[in-house]
Amino acid sequence: MTNKVRTRFAPSPTGYMHVGNLRTALYAYLIAKHDNGDFILRIEDTDQERLVEGALDVIYNTLKITGLSHDEGPDIGGPVGPYVQSERRNIYIEYAEKLIEKGEAYYCFCSKERLDMLRANSEALKRPFRYDKHCIDLSKEEIDKKIAEGVPYVIRQKNPTTGSTSFHDEIYGDISVDNSELDDMILIKSDGLPTYNFANVVDDHLMGITHVVRGSEYLSSSPKYNRLYEAFGWDVPIYVHCPPIMKDEHHKLSKRNGDASFEDLMAKGYLKEAILNYIALLGWNPGGEKEVFSMEELIEAFNYRNINKAPAVFDTKKLKWMNGEYIRALSLDKFHEMALPYYEEALTRDLDTKKISELLHTRVEVLNEIPEQLDFFNNLLEYSPKMYIHKKMKTTYENSLKSLEEVLPKLEALENWTFENIKEVCMNLVKELEVKNGVVLWPIRTAVSGKQFTPGGAFEIADILGKEETLERIKIGIDKLKALQ
């Protein structure tokens, strides 16, 4: 292998794309692309019981949607395949046997019952479970006999009980662990498949991975990884352990607890660019005030040494704000295209949706806010006459009624129903009555919408509703106000 930077994203196909997994993929991608390196996709499916049908498609689709394009992987191949761990079974067995020859691993024939008893004893003593090395000194004859008899076995790593193992992480610094704390972890399971930990080390070496990006929960396993690298005489890759993502101060974000996945966020109307931008900042500090980054800018700016140790809190409000920034940066045509499915779902009347998009483009932060802003376009909801009273607009029941009664015949006489003509009629009435704009415009907006807050003013709403519906709603407003007299 060359000195080229090579990173990997190695998910297990066990369900949705959790935000933490996506951040790992993003950081691995950014590290590789910052130095014109390779980003590899590897599928870790050694835990067959946890596999979920369709989850592999989720992984491929997410990488495709987000633009985190891999240079090598199961679907496109590459020079160091196969890229699916279950297809590499013989490779792992070969390397496990090399460790046995070196005296760095051993066969373990302990039954499930014996291991359960050891676990129960550990729990009773409130100690972490560690295998007691019962099989470590079996002779070759004993081993051959048991294998010939078909006794199930695993292959375990042989760790020392004295001294310490040290490793360096780019985020957490130098870490040293007493070897007495290291369990003789299983390398090859009784079904012949490797454990996650063993497969990782073998694959990362054989695939030339230079930077290993993963969550900080794997810090505790790193000494055992290092012992494997040393046993094989391999170079240790650069470790980049990322801090956990928290849903709040005390709870980690977790797909098992139903916290938002990438698919969930997309379904709620967040833009993929905003999600990636926000996730990039969960633990990484670019320095300076800038927070909105394109993918090209992220690739250029990303330095993994600026990742923080402190847990990052997933702040939905901040994500929402950032998504709003991205929506406002869209062209009107692009926003309209993205809004159309929401209009089809929410609107029951045939209206000019392009005009609605002009109103909403700068007023929504998440696309799924669109339907709640459209209800009054379908029909006039019941509202209280008190809405006509607005202190700032200086409106009362009396002057609101006067404004509506005065504007009604003028709008009825309007032959060409356009925004400009509606505006001209209303503003002429303001001059005619010698009042502030709000005295005329607030009652009209209230009458045509029945809402205190709308994504547009009186002119825009009347233009979109059309002449007949606008006049009908103004008449209803007049009746409401007359009923108070």
From Swiss-Prot:
Transmembrane segments: none annotated. The keyword Transport does not apply. Its EC number is 6.1.1.17. Signal peptide: none annotated. It is an enzyme of class 6 (ligase). GO terms for biological process: glutamyl-tRNA aminoacylation. GO terms for molecular function: ATP binding; glutamate-tRNA ligase activity; tRNA binding; zinc ion binding. A motif ('KMSKS' region) lies at residues 252-256. SUPFAM superfamilies: An anticodon-binding domain of class I aminoacyl-tRNA synthetases, Nucleotidylyl transferase. Keywords: Aminoacyl-tRNA synthetase, ATP-binding, Cytoplasm, Ligase, Metal-binding, Nucleotide-binding, Protein biosynthesis, Zinc. It catalyses: tRNA(Glu) + L-glutamate + ATP = L-glutamyl-tRNA(Glu) + AMP + diphosphate. Binds 1 zinc ion per subunit. InterPro entries: aa-tRNA-synth_I_cd-bd, aa-tRNA-synth_I_codon-bd_sub2, aa-tRNA-synth_I_CS, aa_tRNA-synth_I_cd-bd_sf, Glu-tRNA-ligase_bac/mito, Glu/Gln-tRNA-synth, Glu/Gln-tRNA-synth_Ib_cat-dom, GluQ/Sye. PANTHER family: GLUTAMATE--TRNA LIGASE, GLUTAMATE--TRNA LIGASE, MITOCHONDRIAL-RELATED. Monomer. Catalyzes the attachment of glutamate to tRNA(Glu) in a two-step reaction: glutamate is first activated by ATP to form Glu-AMP and then transferred to the acceptor end of tRNA(Glu). Belongs to the class-I aminoacyl-tRNA synthetase family. Glutamate--tRNA ligase type 1 subfamily. This is Glutamate--tRNA ligase. It comes from Clostridium botulinum (strain Okra / Type B1). The lineage of its organism: Bacteria, Bacillati, Bacillota, Clostridia, Eubacteriales.
